[in-house]
């Protein structure tokens, strides 16, 4: 939160599971941090946090939750929201956490409504996400940005340009590559 305010940038970050021991539920969430003077020349001293949830657990999450306490099992608490974040002149952003990127219904809702889709991921199957990103960029006609954990690599930014050599804006391919990248995305 402090870093987002210091650099005056909207920041998305994955966080650990929320475990509700009373309800025996597990939630997978991310946070969006918006500094109070974002997109101005003023220095930000505080920020607002919004929690964004995940609808579909991955198979690995299902197994982890199942084995967590077999005598008194936990369940995954789904967040059915499909987020569209209005960032003003920078366009509207559809936000997705990991396995929700496989949810085709989401793209029908986002088509014509967003200029960007941002996916926070902890994904070993990076080739599937790469293939889906190209298809989604062309079907939804928006930029697709995948921010994968550095351990598995393959973060990328893909845009639906007509000329194929322009489509891949950024790709960090390979395991154990930790990086921060600033890129320009088209907004139409």
Region roles according to the model:
Residues 1-18, 23-24, 101-187:
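CN hydrolase (nitrilase-like) catalytic-core segments centered on the catalytic cysteine
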Residues 20-112:
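Active-site catalytic loop in hydrolytic enzyme cores
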Residues 38-55, 163-176, 188:
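Acidic Ser/Thr/Pro-rich low-complexity disordered segments
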């Amino acid at each position: 939160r402090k870093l987002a305010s210091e650099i005056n940038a909207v920041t998305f970050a994955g966080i650990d599971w929320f475990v509700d021991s009373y309800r025996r539920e597990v939630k997978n969430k991310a946070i969006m941090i918006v500094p109070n003077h974002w997109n101005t020349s003023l220095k930000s001293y505080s920020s607002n946090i919004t929690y964004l949830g995940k609808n579909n657990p991955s198979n690995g999450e299902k197994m982890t939750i199942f084995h967590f306490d077999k005598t008194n099992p936990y369940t995954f608490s789904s967040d059915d929201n499909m987020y569209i974040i209005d960032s003003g002149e920078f366009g509207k952003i559809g936000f997705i956490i990991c396995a929700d990127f496989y949810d085709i219904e989401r793209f029908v809702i986002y088509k014509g409504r967003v200029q960007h889709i941002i996916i926070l991921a902890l994904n070993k199957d990076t080739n599937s996400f790469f293939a889906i990103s190209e298809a989604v960029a062309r079907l939804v006609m928006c930029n697709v940005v995948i921010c994968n954990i550095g351990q598995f690599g393959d973060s990328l930014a893909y845009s639906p340009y007509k000329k194929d050599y322009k489509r891949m804006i950024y790709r960090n391919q390979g395991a154990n590559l930790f990086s921060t990248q600033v890129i320009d995305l088209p907004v139409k």
